Design a protein with these regions (language model features):
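N-terminal membrane topogenesis motif
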Residues: 1-26, 82, 86, 227-254, ...
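Interfacial/gating helices of multi-pass transporter permease domains
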Residues: 35-55, 185-190, 235-243, 266-294, ...
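Interfacial segments at transmembrane-helix termini and the short loops linking adjacent helices
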Residues: 111-130, 281, 347-376, 489-490
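Membrane-interface junctions at transmembrane-helix termini in multi-pass inner-membrane proteins
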Residues: 136-159, 374-404
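Membrane-proximal transmembrane or re-entrant/amphipathic helices at the cytosolic face
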Residues: 478-541
Length: 541
């Protein structure tokens, strides 16, 4: 049973991760040309509005779908199909009401929100355009939480691909159309962000279809054939809220700090000596653009943070603490193996990456990405460690760590952004400090409060060494290739060739180092689809 649960966990994570690869490719197709169409200033407007949207979305969907997934998993483990059905219905109504309230607020008061949250009235059109997404995503997340609680990750993956595909097509089409018509930058940015709303609608329709096709009928039949008497609506709602609200508060802490981060940057930068309002908009746009790449490693880790919830919850219900510890250590180790090389690669190859992907970027862009590449490693580990604590019923502990990290982030902004020699880089430095604090505290909480034995040195040190060697090789190979190909004189094609060569060698070196340092164990490989064949191919013992 324990081995089956661990297999299901990593199989689910693998399905979600495969979808993430497609989603990230589509996302790059969307955001990279989008930034080049509407410019860094326009992308700054887009990003600022998205930050406001993300705050309301986090309040609505960060914790409650996790609670739903956990409660459905527990009900299924205990053989209570009627309780699972009631939990889903309660969750759907609750999420729908929350989504409707926040959507109406954004529709009716876009200018007030733009000024209050990010100190930019020019963002109001973007806020209005993205507002329907809150309601649509709330409803979608109810279906996702229910289906994931049943151990099926495929509909979530397909739904996300549908969402991003529609967003790409609609968003880019509107951005190009408005730009060619000579519309202002705020209007073009609003057209681009409206694609998010249309994509959210497409995802909702797909998840509704999946639920009706695969779950509605069988769930009703299971309930009818069972003698399970579900808990009252009030009791179900209370437990749903009791589990979900602490998780929501924890996630909302970081979303709120992101809003404060955005507001502080936009308040401080224009008044820094030698910058002024126009350059401040450009610098914030560069910072926003770099976050597109900085978020890439976290996107590959998010599937694991989703899949770990029902796996640990089911083990905890059976009081299988050894299994909880095993899943916890595996998830932390695998997240480090994935996140560390990606973060290191972004850091050492920031210059050529920015030059290739974003034409005419501000000179601060590569330096920002170097810092954010380092920060991305801590972000990934914090995502997984938060999910581990939440899945084991320790929902309040991540709130403490995120409050501490957020406070450090604000302090760094206040101290560093206003300094002329640092300015926008202060925000990136603060991000490193913020998530490093969260990771350290979460690891302490896992060891002390979950009563499991985790070998952190074995989980983190081998991939750290492997990533350091890989990063050094990537830096050296790119430098050599750039000289041989005369990158500075030959244009973007030679730049791309040098970058591909560096990345290719880096990947090969990292795979060798993973084997040499035993960053991944044979036990880990057995838990992923085709893992034993891969382990045999890579000589992992």
């Amino acid at each position: 049973m324990a081995e089956e649960n661990r297999q299901n966990f990593l199989h689910g994570a693998a399905i979600l991760a495969a979808g993430v690869v497609v989603i990230k490719i589509l996302g790059a197709i969307y955001k990279i040309p989008l930034r080049n169409i509407i410019g860094e200033t326009g992308y700054g407007y887009f990003f600022a509005a998205y930050t406001i949207y993300n705050f309301f979305l986090t309040i609505s969907t960060a914790g409650l779908p996790v609670a739903l997934s956990r409660m459905i998993s527990e009900a299924n483990t205990l053989g209570r199909p009627c309780q699972a059905r009631r939990t889903f219905r309660v969750a759907m109504v609750t999420l729908g009401v929350l989504g409707l309230v926040f959507t109406l607020l954004m529709l009716l008061f876009p200018t007030e929100m733009a000024i209050a949250f990010v100190s930019k009235a020019t963002v109001s059109r973007c806020v209005f355009a993205i507002s329907p997404s809150v309601l649509l995503v709330c409803l979608t997340s109810a279906f996702r939480g229910y289906i994931q609680g049943n151990g099926n990750m495929k509909p979530t993956t397909v739904g996300q691909v549908v969402e991003v595909l529609v967003k790409v097509v609609v968003g880019l089409a509107l951005a190009i159309w408005f730009t060619r018509m000579g519309k202002s930058v705020p209007v073009s940015a609003a057209g681009a962000i409206f694609g998010v709303s249309v994509g959210s609608l497409a995802a909702l329709l797909y998840m509704l279809w999946s639920y009706l096709k695969e779950y509605r009928g069988p769930a009703a039949l299971k309930c009818a054939a069972s003698d399970d008497v579900p808990d009252s609506v009030g009791r179900t709602l209370w437990r749903f809220v009791r589990i979900g609200v602490p998780i929501t508060l924890g996630a909302s802490v970081m979303s709120l700090f992101s809003l404060i981060d955005t507001k502080l940057i936009n308040m401080q930068l224009p008044h820094v000596p030698g910058i002024g309002p126009a350059l401040a908009d450009e610098l914030y746009g560069a910072y926003s653009t770099m976050t597109t790449l900085y978020n890439l490693p976290a996107a590959f880790i998010t599937p694991m943070s989703i899949a770990v919830v029902p796996a640990i919850s089911a083990a905890a219900v059976r009081r299988a603490r050894g299994e909880v510890g095993s899943i916890t250590e595996s998830s932390l180790r695998i997240s480090a193996v994935i996140a560390m090389p990606m973060g290191a690669g972004l850091a050492v190859l920031a210059g050529p990456i920015v030059e290739l992907m974003f034409r005419d970027s501000n000179a601060a862009g590569p330096v920002i990405l170097t810092y954010l590449g380092i920060a991305s490693v801590f972000v990934c580990i914090s995502l997984v460690s938060n999910a581990i604590l939440q899945a084991d019923g320790k929902e309040t502990l991540p709130i403490i760590s995120m409050l501490a990290g957020g406070a450090v982030k604000i302090a760094c902004n206040l101290l560093l952004v206003s300094r002329p020699e640092i300015h926008i880089l202060g925000a990136a430095i603060g991000t490193i400090a913020c998530y490093a604090v969260i990771c350290i505290l979460n690891c302490i909480f896992i060891s002390r409060n979950m009563k499991v034995s985790i070998r952190y040195g074995k989980a983190f040190l081998p991939p750290l060494v492997s990533s350091a060697v890989m990063a050094a090789c990537a830096w050296a190979v790119y430098g050599l290739a750039a000289r041989l190909l005369h990158v500075g004189q030959s244009g973007r094609i030679m730049l791309a060739a040098a970058l591909v060569a560096a990345i290719g060698i880096a990947v090969a070196v990292y795979l060798v180092m993973v084997i040499v340092t035993r960053s991944v164990t044979l036990e880990d490989m057995k838990l992923i689809p085709k893992g034993q064949k891969i382990a045999k191919l890579l000589h992992i013992r």
